[in-house]
């Protein structure tokens, strides 16, 4: 499989290493500016590389990605950028009429499993308060994480009229049943931790996922790419790939 990388930060550097270990080829990298230390061919546009690649894997940011998605091309896409999620999904759905597109805010299959466990738990715990917490390294710039937003969306689909609460320090009233607390922690080198707390009367239940290495996200993207290149045009997630 010949892979075009969109972005060459810490995540796509891992993708490159792990993909080559699996026998795949990195044909080039799209970066905002050419970097002499990047060991691959530099491209400015997807259109420049689409005839050389079987798939593009993106771990970048909206500033780099969105202009590229406006180009005229047909190449399977694995997208892991977080930020501006609604705008991104709308654009990817549009592109999916002409190419297979895979998107996940978190490329870990374990996180996908967590969402399925959450879907099963919510109907059983209707009277429990829910609090969501995520923790990441001190270099992560967006908050809450795309994964936590995904977990909140699962809850929103199954509980009617819920309200996200991001900060309680100015509130001087009791917690209401429709609230879902959302908390972000940034520090050190934490790879990624996500907790869903169900708090009931005299008991609590916690669903938790802790990433121990960023390799799980890189491997998840590579596995998605391996499957995606054999799919027909369409919009794919872990639910249907």
UniProtKB/Swiss-Prot annotation:
What pathway is this protein a component of?
Answer: Amino-acid biosynthesis; L-lysine biosynthesis via DAP pathway; (S)-tetrahydrodipicolinate from L-aspartate: step 4/4
What is the similarity comment for this entry? Belongs to the DapB family.
PANTHER family, per database record = 4-HYDROXY-TETRAHYDRODIPICOLINATE REDUCTASE, DIHYDRODIPICOLINATE REDUCTASE
List ligand-binding residues for (S)-2,3,4,5-tetrahydrodipicolinate.
137, 146-147
Q: What is the protein name stated in its UniProt record?
A: 4-hydroxy-tetrahydrodipicolinate reductase
Superkingdom assignment: Bacteria
Which GO CC terms are listed, alphabetically?
cytosol
E.C. no: 1.17.1.8
- Quickly give the catalysed reaction: (S)-2,3,4,5-tetrahydrodipicolinate + NAD(+) + H2O = (2S,4S)-4-hydroxy-2,3,4,5-tetrahydrodipicolinate + NADH + H(+); (S)-2,3,4,5-tetrahydrodipicolinate + NADP(+) + H2O = (2S,4S)-4-hydroxy-2,3,4,5-tetrahydrodipicolinate + NADPH + H(+)
Could you read off the lineage of the organism from its UniProt record? Bacteria, Bacillati, Bacillota, Bacilli, Bacillales
Query: Membrane-crossing residues?
Result: none
Q: What's this protein's function?
A: Catalyzes the conversion of 4-hydroxy-tetrahydrodipicolinate (HTPA) to tetrahydrodipicolinate.
UniProt GO BP: diaminopimelate biosynthetic process; lysine biosynthetic process via diaminopimelate
Q: Which compartments is it annotated to reside in?
A: Cytoplasm
Nucleotidyltransferase listed as a keyword: no
Q: Where is the active site?
A: 136, 140
Pfam families from the entry? DapB_C, DapB_N
Record keywords = Amino-acid biosynthesis, Cytoplasm, Diaminopimelate biosynthesis, Lysine biosynthesis, NAD, NADP, Oxidoreductase
Question: Which Gene Ontology terms cover its molecular function?
Answer: 4-hydroxy-tetrahydrodipicolinate reductase; NAD binding; NADP binding; oxidoreductase activity, acting on CH or CH2 groups, NAD or NADP as acceptor
Where is NAD(+) bound in this sequence? 80-82, 104-107
UniProt keyword Amino-acid biosynthesis present: yes
